[in-house]
């Protein structure tokens, strides 16, 4: 059906109107068309979405790269930035005594570092939490946190229990760094033997220093810059020859003696003459290696090993053995004790000359029993001085070290050969233990040869590294035993020394049920100018039991005060106390030949009819 005339008229009118508008509007240029398209709202929206999608794709790919490809490397870098890189400390093996009691050990302690840059809670809140565990001032902690972003050291020497409490706070930014700390459970009991480890983890004395290589082992977990770790141990431990039980008895009684006589210092050694094992090495005054920084630096030195002194009369038995071995005397000889003699321009007299005067002809045994200086001069005069010097230097090794496995040992000192051989007085003073010097340890070693049938052994405090089964996997090398006296000579000398204890200057060391050989010593101390002053050094050396000689016990007290301070009054009673414990701990049966034992055997049993 055709459109109505009106409709056709409207279309013609509309077309005409559009034609007029078209003729009146200027035609759009290509640039205008492009601008129109770019400014289209829809197009702008699409562009924004495209940019966002591209960014998200780029970010996603980057995250994937970081998390999947180089995640491990980034973790290492982060740990290096956030953890504290401390100097690694080498772990150390335990030290134990001859019974396996722990003497030194490692314990894990922690150092707390704080990194405020990693806090997820307010600094004041974290400071308050830490202060409740460590007892620190929270206000001061807050100020510290504000001053630095990372690596603040708050506390050291934190125990495992305290470290556990800190971990329980669950705070970000805390870093507990473990390290081994050397601990000495028995405090000052072994300090001059063990030595100590300083705050930097370095050995400074004793076995810790001497056997650094054997005591230390590398633990790769200790010292790494990771927040939490633990210390592992191997099963090796360093076993010493020291007996903790006897050491404590000796140390306690030595300290009492030093205090009672106002002495400068004291030393007490117990040595097994057959093996050279040192059962006791007590020194007074001493120090606690756990708190070495509080001690007098003089106490760090083991003066029984490092310091020289003139042994005095305790060397007389050694001289008698030399004279017997060199055939200069026999056991039945007599010498004239005039009480006072002149050697060149030097007068020599007995300590008791003012009260006892001359004794006249006396036996070699009585020379030792009464500790006669004049008698010893007459004995050693029978030995050519060249021979005497050869004995001292070559056979006894007075100018050498003993070879003990402790640091700081000092060589003994004797005069040059020409000076000794060419001077009558040098041999005379050496005969009663003056004019030369040695260590306390070397004197004990020499008396050990008398107890060990003439064999000189190397004294030592270390048995070696032992494993969990008790097997020795490493031991120090030691010189072979050296025969310096014949067994017959040592038997004769011990019989003489026995009378010193039974009926002589060493009677304070007499032990019920046992025959003890001994010798007292009271020597004037040489001054720095080479003369002798008023100070003295007193000592007593014993060998027990005489029937089966084995143990040497030597006590030396330096500069005791008082008119009655002699070897027989100061050192001999101290040795007796140690001997009483020694025979019990070592299970030494009573000597049947001792007077008290014979009395006990003859006494009837009260239960018998």
Where in this protein do the model-derived segments appear?
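Small/polar-residue-rich segments within soluble enzyme cores
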Residues: 2, 8-20, 37, 43, ...
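Beta-lactam-recognizing serine transpeptidase/beta-lactamase-like catalytic domain environment
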Residues: 25, 104, 225-226, 272-313, ...
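Second-shell loop/turn segments in exported
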Residues: 81-86, 110-119, 127-131, 148-156, ...
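Membrane-entry signal-anchor segments at the cytosolic-membrane interface
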Residues: 25-54
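Short beta->alpha transition motifs characteristic of CBS
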Residues: 90, 106-111, 115, 196-198, ...
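Short, small/polar residue-rich loop motifs at catalytic or cofactor-binding pockets
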Residues: 87-91, 261-265, 459
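Aromatic-capped interface at the extracytoplasmic side
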Residues: 60-85, 227-228
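Conserved, well-ordered alpha-helix/loop/beta-strand core segments that scaffold catalytic motifs
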Residues: 151, 225-266
